[in-house]
Design a protein with these regions (language model features):
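Charge-rich intrinsically disordered tails and low-complexity stretches
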Residues: 106, 110-111, 130-131
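Conserved small/polar residues in nucleotide/adenosyl-binding loops
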Residues: 140-148
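Acidic-residue sensor for enzyme active/binding pockets
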Residues: 103, 111, 147
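A short, charged, Gly/Pro-tolerant segment at domain boundaries
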Residues: 119-139
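Short glycine/serine- and small hydrophobic-enriched flexible loop segments
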Residues: 111-119
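Glycine-rich phosphate-binding loops that contact phosphosugars or nucleotide phosphates
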Residues: 2-108
Length: 151
């Protein structure tokens, strides 16, 4: 979701990521974009319930179009992917752990939307690169060997 927010910002759209300190209040003119494989993620259910009371429209990207989040959504984009939480809902299987295939499918879907928006807005890669960060911090992951499980 964060990478999609960043791409939308690159397109020149006014975008905020829920939970960041610089995110302003929402209103009925805003669109909330939510991704949840199961459609039952409790923190998202809480956020979307409040957003709906404020008149915010929501687009949901999910595996389960009958979920709690789906019932609150203005629009649903169903993504076919296996999920250990939703084995009853489809016969799809993956050797990847947990919701990996949903997350990968979500990223590809978002990148496709970005390309379509670029076409609609008359933008190309060079134009949107001008909105890319030019001051970046170092991001890294630190894993301590003695804190890992030996397999």
């Amino acid at each position: 979701m964060k990478s999609f927010s960043m791409r939308l910002m690159h397109l020149g759209l006014k975008v905020f990521y829920i939970g960041e300190t610089n995110t302003p209040s929402v209103n009925h003119n805003d669109l909330l974009i939510v991704g949840s494989g199961s459609g039952e993620t409790l923190s998202l259910v809480s956020i979307t319930e409040k957003a709906k009371k404020l008149g915010v429209k929501m687009v949901l990207f999910t595996i389960d179009d009958l979920s709690t989040l789906a019932k609150q959504a203005s629009r649903i984009i169903k993504i076919s992917a296996p999920s250990p939480k939703l084995q009853k809902s489809n016969n799809l299987h993956s050797i990847q752990p947990m919701g990996s295939l949903f997350e990968q499918s979500l990223l590809i879907t978002f990148e496709t939307i970005v390309v379509l928006l670029m076409e609609r807005l008359g933008l190309d890669s060079e134009m949107i690169f001008k909105n890319h960060a030019n001051l970046e911090s170092v991001s890294y992951t630190h894993l301590r060997a003695h804190e890992t499980t030996n397999y």
